[in-house]
């Protein structure tokens, strides 16, 4: 693996997608081979799994089913899109990766971080990011952002109550502590322009 694998993590409404859309042209202008992708999704099979995971009517989905579907989507995305790009020396910017599963299914759903981590170690063959940026934000602020975004389709996870979203953030903070060697916490409750500048600085300082 020759490229650089940067993952962007955060709760709902933390600004991950907007951030990545801004990072992409910046690194392109620097003549850096760069690719943006997302989880779950990024390729046809994983996008189909994303549709299943996000369907509002699938409220009966059991936590283990959810965790395994995310891991399956992750596996296919990794081997079909991420690894080939890394082998071609790309900087890969990925919206979510393993840490999402640890926070959402491992902690918030109560499956246990260690169990979910083992599922994903199997799925990814221990492929881990070069760097992870965690966008930290209070759940109330993130959900308020989502409510104001008329263009965003509300998914099954968005519909969870506030206690779930608080557990997600608690889980993320534990993940940050556990993997402090590769995760950098950035305050997402700031103007997007400043957030972009800060994240660019982190990536360039750590990797480039």
From Swiss-Prot:
UniProt-recorded Gene Ontology molecular function terms = ATP binding; dTMP kinase activity
Job of this protein = Phosphorylation of dTMP to form dTDP in both de novo and salvage pathways of dTTP synthesis.
Q: Which InterPro entries match?
A: P-loop_NTPase, Thymidylate_kin-like_dom, Thymidylate_kin_CS, Thymidylate_kinase
Question: Enzyme group, top EC level?
Answer: transferase
- Mind listing the GO biological process terms from this record? dTDP biosynthetic process; dTTP biosynthetic process; dUDP biosynthetic process
Q: What is this protein called?
A: Thymidylate kinase
- As recorded in Swiss-Prot or TrEMBL, the protein's gene is named tmk
Q: Which organism is it from?
A: Bacillus anthracis
Which CDD domains does its entry note? Answer: TMPK
| EC number in record | 2.7.4.9
Residues bound to ATP: 10-17
Read off the Gene3D superfamilies from this record: P-loop containing nucleotide triphosphate hydrolases
**What catalytic activity is recorded?**
dTMP + ATP = dTDP + ADP
Alphabetical GO CC annotations of the entry are: cytosol
The UniProt keywords, alphabetically, are: ATP-binding, Kinase, Nucleotide biosynthesis, Nucleotide-binding, Transferase
Pfam families referenced in this protein's UniProt entry, alphabetically: Thymidylate_kin
Member of which family?
Belongs to the thymidylate kinase family.
């Amino acid at each position: 693996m020759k490229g650089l694998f940067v993952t962007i993590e955060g709760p709902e409404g933390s600004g991950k997608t907007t951030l990545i859309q801004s990072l992409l042209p910046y690194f392109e202008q620097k003549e850096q081979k760069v690719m943006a992708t997302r989880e779950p999704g990024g390729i046809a099979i994983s996008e189909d799994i994303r549709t299943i995971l996000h369907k509002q009517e699938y409220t009966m989905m059991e936590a283990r089913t959810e965790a395994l579907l995310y891991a399956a989507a992750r596996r296919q995305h990794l081997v079909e899109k991420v690894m080939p790009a890394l082998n071609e020396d790309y900087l890969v910017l990925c919206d979510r990766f393993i840490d999402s599963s640890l926070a959402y299914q491992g902690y918030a759903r109560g499956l246990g971080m260690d169990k979910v981590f083992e599922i994903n170690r199997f799925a990814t063959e221990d492929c881990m990011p070069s760097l992870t940026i965690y966008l930290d934000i209070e759940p109330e602020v993130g959900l308020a952002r989502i409510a104001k975004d008329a263009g965003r389709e509300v998914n099954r996870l968005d519909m969870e109550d506030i206690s779930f979203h608080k557990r997600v953030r608690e889980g993320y903070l534990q993940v940050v502590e556990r993997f402090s060697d590769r995760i950098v916490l950035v305050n997402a409750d700031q103007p997007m322009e400043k957030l972009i500048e800060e994240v660019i600085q982190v990536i360039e300082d750590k990797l480039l």
